[in-house]
A protein has these predicted regions:
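Charged, heptad-repeat coiled-coil alpha-helices that serve as long linker/dimerization "arms"
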Residues: 1-80
Length: 80
């Protein structure tokens, strides 16, 4: 039972690290899309702006999901 708890603890800690890395990648991707968005805004490319806005919205949703997963993992980790 104790070994099970230790394994679970290690697994959750790894998951937190993985989630942090995933969040960082998504944030970097969002930064790139924001740059494209600004360029499209300068060119007044409405179609491109709409497409990029949709991409930004999707990235924001991914970020929220990852933060939620991170919080749930932290809570489980603290309960062990």
């Amino acid at each position: 039972e104790q070994k099970k708890a230790k394994n679970r603890l290690a697994s959750l800690e790894k998951k937190l690290v993985r989630l942090e890395e995933e969040l960082q990648k998504i944030e970097e991707e969002k930064e790139e899309v924001n740059k494209k968005y600004l360029l499209a805004g300068e060119k007044n490319d409405v179609d491109k702006l709409m497409s990029l806005q949709e991409e930004l919205d999707n990235l924001d949703n991914k970020i929220l999901e990852k933060y939620q997963e991170y919080e749930e993992t932290e809570i489980e980790l603290k309960s062990l």
